[in-house]
Amino acid sequence: MATEEFRGHAVRMSTQGSQPGAAPDSVAGTAGLPSGQSGGAGLRLGERPPPAMEKRGPYLVTRAPSIQAKLKKHRDHAKAVLRRKGMLGALTNRPDSSGKRSVKFNKGYTALSQSPDENLVSLDSDSDGELESRYSSGYSSAEQVNQDVSRQLLQDGYHLDEIPDDEDLDLIPPKPIASSACSCCWCCLGDSSCTLQ
């Protein structure tokens, strides 16, 4: 394979025999070079490097630039814009040695100092005792909710028993198996010889 430099990028051309309809290698290799420029000439500022060209048979195939080249071009363009606006200083290339990150806030936002002794939320209340009695922890307890519901029902006219009726809710024992028909086949009709598994 023959390799030729094309403005800083390698161009590979296959040296094949003459094929019908194929352009000669010398014509295809020099087609992209403007007259008067050498192959190793550097790029001017703002001039794009040509894409890498590869000849496959009678065709010239351009390869897309790599992602690293695209990212570098994007970074260089962003630096140039910031330099023109005067926002790019000499301190941007030096990493921060203190280990702390500085945070930039958008317009209208202020930073909260989140020290443990400072409340992030303030509630309007006349007394702190009332606040602590209703919201003693982050979770509402079931007893507190139950008392509030009972108080509201009493105000609405419903009279609830003060003693819960848990004792009255015992389950009724089931009937003996011998007195009823077999549940598996209904054939026994009280015969004790059939047992349930």
Swiss-Prot record:
Reading the lineage from the top rank, the first entry is: Eukaryota
Q: Where is this region: Disordered?
A: 1-77, 117-142
What InterPro entries does this protein map onto?
A: FAM219
First and last residue of the signal peptide:
none
List residues, modification Phosphoserine. 14, 125, 127
Question: What keywords does the record list, in alphabetical order?
Answer: Phosphoprotein
Q: Got any disulfides in this one, which pairs?
A: none
Q: Which family does it belong to?
A: Belongs to the FAM219 family.
* Protein name, as recorded: Protein FAM219B
What species was this sequence derived from? Mus musculus
Q: What is the lineage of its organism?
A: Eukaryota, Metazoa, Chordata, Craniata, Vertebrata
